[in-house]
Amino acid sequence: MASFPPSLVFTVRRKEPTLVLPSKPTPRELKQLSDIDDQEGFRFQVPVIMFYKRKLYMEGEDPVKVIREALAEALVFYYPFAGRLIEGPNRKLVVDCTSEGVLFIEADADIELNQLIGDTIDPGTYLDELLHDVPGSEGIVGCPLLLIQVTRFRCGGWAFAIRLNHTMSDTLGLVQFLTTIAEFTRGAEDAPSVPPVWQREFLAARQPPFIPFQHHEYEQVIDTIPDDNKKSMTHKSFFFGPKEIRAIRSHLPHHHRSTSSTFDVLTACLWRCRTCALGLDPQMTVRISCAANGRGKHGLHVPRGYYGNVSAFPATVLRAGIISTSPLEYAMEGVKKAKAIMTGEYLRSVADLMVTKGRPRYTVAGNYIVSDMTRVGLDTIDFGWGKPVYGGPARAFPLISFYGRFKDNKGEDGTVVLICLPEAALERFQEELKKMTGEHVDGPFDYKPIKVVSKL
């Protein structure tokens, strides 16, 4: 597997956070979120990051100034992002469009971009420095809905990091907003090419509710995972190029090798390795939940420009012992089954379930959620410096892994997977992964983490 950068020490100097407001007056109103948006499973902040190289044709342009000004213009059209959430009866979330603004941080780091990105990328290692968690900003209700940090590197490259309140948008909705910012940075004068559409009633629960599906992803079960598996969580990224994917495919029967997508093969491998690494009881029920986009699904006519959540996490269940000891095809069939569940009717069933069951959280015990962000467009956002050398997820969560696109130093395209596991489980995970890829996998202590010094 790919190696990580050597131990580095760098200093990040940040200015005090400021609030960026819409550049023109916007309506003061209340706007309800949909019954997909405000479920418990979306009440968290999700970070993404983009890295840009120095471009000679942009000499003299300050990315901080360029982004800040374009952001203010974009917020005129996406003014709910400048508001704050309030919670009404039955935990219903509503945006109070106050135009208070979004948090913005200007920063400088005494490091070069190529020192952070090499054969692979591990943004979770240094995310806290490139996206400062402003005290008091981490909540869902009454807090800024976006946090942005633009960090300049001494080489002329820079990073754009953003943290989104997930109840407001899914990743595709975020990309639509970022595309609008990018259009303004490149000289758009009037309005975004795709006007934003609110219409959150589009995914409101039906009256009366109708739940024709069994939603394994929301079943509330007793958590029997050992406490040791919940401590000392460690972040790490893994790069899977064509060579690694071929090695994983070799564990499948011939009839599956050519008919299974890279996502199917990779997700089955990760689910198996993670299940083994956590040492779960063989009789324990485990789940694979695949984040699925509802746009384009039969029976769901999503308005063009809609930037709310249009995603669900359909799941399939198996015994941990089957996943960890059976051939890889068992895990892969579970992945394929989870993907196949998603339809427009399924998403509406989720909305009805939320209202009927009090907006439950997704299952925690034995669940593994994967979100493929390789095709959402984060790697195409051009603020005037061209496409980013990396644009994608910035950090995993204990139950959630994200996939991003990445091209290594050899020019080889592949998938970066962000993982979050307890230290001991991460070591076992890498050993299991080594068996699947047939290559050496750097152990968690084979490299020294990047050291950073923060200064305001």
From Swiss-Prot:
Broad class of enzyme this protein falls into: transferase
EC number in record: 2.3.1.-
Signal peptide start and end residues: none
InterPro entries assigned: CAT-like_dom_sf, Plant_acyltransferase
Transferase listed as a keyword: yes
Record-annotated membrane-spanning stretches: none
Tissue expression summary: Expressed in fruit.
Keyword Transferase listed: yes
Active site (catalytic residues): 166 (proton acceptor), 382 (proton acceptor)
Gene Ontology MF term list: acyltransferase activity
Top-rank taxon, per record: Eukaryota
Inducers of expression: Induced by ethylene in ripe fruits.
Chain's role: Involved in the biosynthesis of volatile esters which confer kiwifruit flavor. Alcohol acyl transferase that can use a wide range of alcohols as substrate to produce esters.
Stated family: Belongs to the plant acyltransferase family.
Protein known as: Alcohol acyltransferase 17
Lineage: Eukaryota, Viridiplantae, Streptophyta, Embryophyta, Tracheophyta
